[in-house]
Swiss-Prot record:
Binding site for L-glutamine: S47, G244, G246, L273, Q276, N314, G316, F317
GO MF annotations in UniProt: ATP binding; carbamoyl-phosphate synthase (glutamine-hydrolyzing) activity; glutaminase activity
Gene3D superfamilies, per database record: 3.40.50.880, Carbamoyl-phosphate synthase small subunit, N-terminal domain
Protein name from the UniProt record: Carbamoyl phosphate synthase small chain
InterPro entries named in the record: Anth_synth/Amidotransfase, CarbamoylP_synth_ssu, CarbamoylP_synth_ssu_N, CarbP_synth_ssu_N_sf, Class_I_gatase-like, CPSase_GATase1, GATASE
Residues annotated as catalytic: C272, H356, E358
Family, as annotated: Belongs to the CarA family.
Source species: Halomonas eurihalina
Task performed by this protein: Small subunit of the glutamine-dependent carbamoyl phosphate synthetase (CPSase). CPSase catalyzes the formation of carbamoyl phosphate from the ammonia moiety of glutamine, carbonate, and phosphate donated by ATP, constituting the first step of 2 biosynthetic pathways, one leading to arginine and/or urea and the other to pyrimidine nucleotides. The small subunit (glutamine amidotransferase) binds and cleaves glutamine to supply the large subunit with the substrate ammonia.
CDD domains: GATase1_CPSase
Length: 381
């Protein structure tokens, strides 16, 4: 028997649908993602912390869920909004249905939604604070009013430091390589790993670590608030700054650590939130975007070669190109809206990219950035 669910937005919009997953109430910033595949990777991406994700592709859950296609240990998104949940999940890798997976992780979802209407609203008005009520919480004459109250009570992501919330609690080593059919994820612990990389976990996606490990990196992952002196004492060949959720500006601990690294000649590579933090540490500024970039088909141009790459994106903040100091150079730009996508320091071996070269989900056109990072470490030796 189906259960009711309500999605309310801070502007007063109310949507009714069917509850999937857990019962109860959740709130967060409502965003939309245009990727056609990879819903499990999207849900488990820590960058979606405190966000309710609307998937624009109409059929979600067709292939179920498995234990391999995860980017973290649990679902990070605050909620899920979809058009249609198929009754049957069909895949030789399927271990669980999407609805059971959501319920097991105590995450709310709403199906049978007019996602096209919702997406157009978010596109035109910008990302909205919202709330989902599911199951018994969505019943009663005052349900809509309670949903609206919860939506308007959410403080929004501007000024919210979430990197230290989703980060690991203790340092750990990583030795899992890339996935292949029939073999799963490779164990690279016994292989040749000439480069020691210390990776800051601001909300790390696992596929980033896999792609670095596959390129000969011995990885030590450290919590977001690890002081620079502790990292430098590890004598790394390179320092990686991960993706993550929330506003980069409140992350003073990260910015000060990166500034210390930039006083050395150690190569630094940042992705997503790490890109924004590198920019802030170098003197640039960031801005909250209207509705952000969330999808797997975003064209980005390499400003040096002119080459266009299709990229995976997931961010609601961006570096303001007009604020770049003289020691920062723009190297990538979005062909959707012209926003800055990549920077490099002109005086230090440091660069970053706003999108996700590791994909998961999405294309790997930008994966050579990992090779560039490895080459920088090789050149420094």
């Amino acid at each position: 028997m189906s259960k009711p669910a309500i999605l309310a937005l801070e502007d007063g919009s109310v949507f009714h649908g069917t509850a999937i997953g857990a019962d109860g109430q959740t709130s967060g910033e409502v965003v939309f993602n245009t990727a056609m595949t990879g819903y499990q990777e999207i849900l488990t991406d820590p960058s979606y912390s405190r966000q309710i994700v609307t998937l624009t592709y109409p059929h979600i859950g067709n292939t179920g869920v498995n234990s391999e296609d995860v980017e973290s240990s649990s679902i990070a998104a605050a909620g899920l909004v979809i058009r249609d949940l198929p009754l049957l999940a069909s895949s030789f890798r399927c271990e669980q249905s999407l609805s059971d997976y959501l319920a097991q992780q105590n995450v709310l979802g709403i199906a049978d939604m007019h996602t096209r209407r919702l997406t157009r609203l978010l596109r035109d008005k910008g990302s909205q604070n919202g709330a989902i009520l599911a199951g018994p919480d969505a019943e009663g004459e005052d349900a809509e009013a309670r949903a609206l109250e919860a939506a308007r009570a959410f403080p929004g992501l501007k000024g919210m430091d979430l990197a230290k919330v989703v980060s690991c609690a203790e340092p750990y080593e990583w030795s899992e390589g890339e996935w292949t059919l029939g073999s799963g994820y490779a164990d690279v612990s016994q292989g040749d790993r000439p480069y020691h990389v210390v990776a800051y976990d601001y909300g790390m996606k696992r596929n980033i670590l896999r792609m670095l490990a596959a390129r000969g990196c011995r990885l030590t992952v450290v919590p977001a608030q690890t002081p620079a002196e502790e990292v430098l004492a590890m004598n790394p060949d390179g320092i990686f700054l991960s993706n993550g959720p929330g506003d980069p500006e409140p992350c003073d601990y990260a910015i000060s650590a990166i500034q210390a690294f930039l006083e050395t000649e150690i190569p630094v590579f940042g992705i997503c939130l790490g890109h924004q933090l590198l920019a802030l540490a170098s003197g640039a500024q960031t801005v909250k975007m209207n509705h952000g970039h969330h999808g797997a088909n975003h064209p980005v141009q390499d400003l040096d070669s002119g080459r266009v790459m299709i990229t995976s994106q997931n961010h609601g903040f961006a570096v303001e190109e007009s604020t770049l100091p003289d020691n920062l150079r723009a190297i990538h730009r979005s062909l959707f809206d012209g926003t800055l996508q990549g920077i490099e320091r002109t005086d230090r071996p440091a660069f970053s990219f706003q999108g996700h070269p590791e994909a998961s989900p999405g294309p790997r056109d930008v994966a050579p950035l990992f090779d560039r990072f490895v080459e920088m470490m090789r050149h420094r030796r």
